Regions:
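PLP-dependent amino-acid enzyme catalytic core
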Residues: 1-230
Length: 230
């Protein structure tokens, strides 16, 4: 008797809808993914992360093989979200500097001349952990400030991990996650900071040249990038 395997689709509605219509979303195009991968490879500390095989588990499930991408090695952050953080922060910075991220590499963006121009930029985000770590780490790389808000109940080890990568401030709020996001976004709007969030809502779906910029549209591109041998 065959075993039934229960699984959960981790796709996004718009992606699935476009696939059904026979078209691939533009942000998943091979040429787009290649450009993002090229940028990531220019970041100091970049290295291909290991791909582990689980043949025994695959055999149990009647599969040919199972592969697990070990992202704990990514930029020394013990998390894959440094990819999203550095890409989003770099995109915002390139807009300010008038650079094209598809043509610029990390060293060009991070030159001493450019760092002087962006030294007063401030990024803010809300996080349960790894997303905030990625944003704080990326902002620090460029000599910018990063404020990270975390929901109530966050354990101290997660707070300290974000402090350790260079966050300007890590604040554990009195709110749960959704209200913590709202709180961070409000502070971004009040201060003219850049909100870098991995949660989307109405009015926050793509980049706009306003005081509180939206990032999710770019971050979607990274899903494909991490699937490649990177």
């Amino acid at each position: 008797m065959e075993r039934q395997i229960t699984w959960t689709n981790n796709g996004i509605g718009i992606i699935e809808a476009e696939k059904r219509q026979g078209t691939e979303p533009a942000f998943l195009a091979e040429e787009v993914v290649e450009k993002i991968a090229a940028f990531h490879s220019s970041v100091p500390g970049y290295a291909v992360t290991p791909l582990a095989e689980l043949p025994a588990r695959a055999k149990e499930l009647g599969l040919e093989n199972i592969f697990v991408k070990d992202e704990s090695h990514r930029f020394g952050l013990n998390a894959f979200k440094g990819l999203g953080g550095v890409y989003a922060v770099s995109k915002v910075i390139c807009e300010k500097l008038g650079l094209d991220l598809e043509k610029a590499d990390f060293s060009q963006i991070c030159s001493e001349e450019n760092k002087e121009k962006i030294k007063d930029m401030v990024f803010i985000t809300a996080t349960d952990g790894n997303h905030g770590k990625g944003v704080a780490w990326a902002a620090k790389k460029f000599g910018c400030q990063a404020y990270v808000y975390m929901p109530k109940g966050t354990v101290e080890s997660r707070v300290q991990a974000i402090r350790d990568v260079g966050a300007t401030e890590v604040l554990v709020t009195d709110y749960f996650y959704d209200d913590t996001v709202r709180m961070a976004n409000k502070r971004a709007e009040e201060n003219g900071w850049t909100m870098v969030q991995d949660t989307a809502w109405e009015g926050y779906e793509k980049f706009r040249l306003i005081s509180c910029r939206a990032i999710p549209h770019w971050r979607k591109k990274l899903w494909s990038s991490s699937r490649k041998k990177a």
